[in-house]
Amino acid sequence: METKVSFYEIIQRMNKLNILHRINIHKQAVKNGLYLGQLPILEYVERHEKCTQREVADYMKVSPPSIATSVKRMQKAGLLEKVADKSDLRYNRLTVTEKGRKISKKCRKDFDKVDEQLFSGFNEKECEQLRGFFERMIDNMRTDELANKNFFSLIAEEKKFFDKKSEEE
């Protein structure tokens, strides 16, 4: 495809936008006393009350020990509680504390403000167009094995790729 627009420049702008967004989201997480990956855990446990660490790990496509570390940290901060499963004492069930609910709600609100700032000056039609452009680009980049994977699955795939690459070196 021949064009006067530099694809490289567009990709650089998309990458810059992604980095700026992540920095601003990270600032909001820290302001609310969370590490970056903790809000998705809190929100998952809120939606799936009394879930297991394994279920959270499966959803986020990370290892159970990785979730165990986060859960331990979140317990210590008073955000989550572990409750022994009465029907099977081998399992612990996770619940969000009142403090965790308040922080989750506040953090989500702050994250939404970052997103609102990002899209300020765009009308609804422009946002729909932008979403459509991104969907087309995503479709262009899909391969059979990645076609139906969710966000967390794609992150896990990326990690596997880089882990495999570093093992080869």
What are these regions (language model features)?
Residues 1-32, 163-169:
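N-terminal leader segment of winged-helix/HTH proteins
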Residues 75-135:
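Charged, amphipathic alpha-helical coiled-coil/dimerization segments
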Residues 1-2, 125-169:
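C-terminal regulatory/oligomerization modules of transcriptional regulators
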Residues 23-66:
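N-terminal helix-turn-helix DNA-binding core of bacterial DNA-binding proteins
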Residues 54, 72, 92:
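Residues within the helices of the helix-turn-helix
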Residues 15, 43-47, 108:
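Short, locally clustered residues in the helix-turn-helix/winged-helix DNA-binding domain
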